[in-house]
């Protein structure tokens, strides 16, 4: 095998909703596709179609009528390893078109990922894909690196889960990490519900994808929710049109800001949970009093569900209301935050100082999967 230094590492960020994959040193992922595996609903239906037992991604999307679609990752944690393996196989061979046995692989994991899961990821990379080296990094930590910081608190909110992760000098503080099972998928479901109240019906998986697009293109966060609702009663300033694939045009108004408001008021969907602002505050309060100032001053947003216009101003306002009055608060919403986990991985894997951090195949062969706890933390 050639020297590890000469070979570009692969970076793969497996989200609940989307896989982001590419090469270390690049400034954006080369491949972004849904974390979906489709399996035939009825044995025999697919006869003569090459008889695959599983389809990934676009194939799954296009044949969705006869396939059952499954997301192998749930709330950020992998729960179906066979399907996850299919997704990695597709990532390496079809999307990136590389031989994984020739590249070190950096994978990402959710904060508080169970130990057994980290071991399983490690085992699959070395035993199934014969990777020469691998590493597992916490998603929120990578987002913080991507913002050019090593200390701060990250709110990472994707499709399946949100976390608040305080990080001090590059290390996540596990006792203060909080998880909120409220994220993009719940917002899409809520948008479906409130559009139904307007008389628009979206029921199939395909139609829900349309609603996800409506959400991504038109939703925003109000600085003051009640005031925004009052404004919409008197005029049509917030109304926007959206053309459906069949040419029908729908109009949406208050739904635009009612949908993401759930992040701050989970009770809107009947959830008994603190909103993202309060969860962030609770995370900070679990940290040593001496570092709180650094956390308040470096609050970084990351993940697709932080892409709503207005989120940074709203977050500042809400945290300001909870924090001590003299505290200086800074909320950072980098424009590339949808991919900042991946970008942080790309940066980390290309650092010369990182090269001694990889778990090498030889170390794995000697120690087994538990090596991951000693080398990745």
From Swiss-Prot:
EC number(s) from the headed UniProt entry: 3.6.4.-
Keyword Transferase on entry: no
GO biological process: cell division
PROSITE patterns in the cross-refs: ACTINS_1, ACTINS_2, ACTINS_ACT_LIKE
Gene3D superfamilies, A to Z: 3.30.420.40, Actin, Chain A, domain 4 (3.90.640.10)
Cross-referenced InterPro entries: Actin, Actin/actin-like_CS, Actin_CS, ATPase_NBD
Swiss-Prot/TrEMBL keywords: ATP-binding, Cytoplasm, Cytoskeleton, Hydrolase, Nucleotide-binding
SMART domains reported in the protein's UniProt record: ACTIN
Reaction catalysis annotation: ATP + H2O = ADP + phosphate + H(+)
Molecular function via GO: ATP binding; hydrolase activity
One Gene Ontology term, aspect cellular component: cytosol
Family to which this protein belongs: Belongs to the actin family.
PANTHER family assigned to the protein according to its UniProt record, in alphabetical order: ACTIN
Protein's job: Actins are highly conserved proteins that are involved in various types of cell motility and are ubiquitously expressed in all eukaryotic cells. Essential component of cell cytoskeleton; plays an important role in cytoplasmic streaming, cell shape determination, cell division, organelle movement and extension growth.
Miscellaneous field: There are at least 13 actin genes in potato.
Protein name per UniProt: Actin-71
Organism: Solanum tuberosum (Potato)
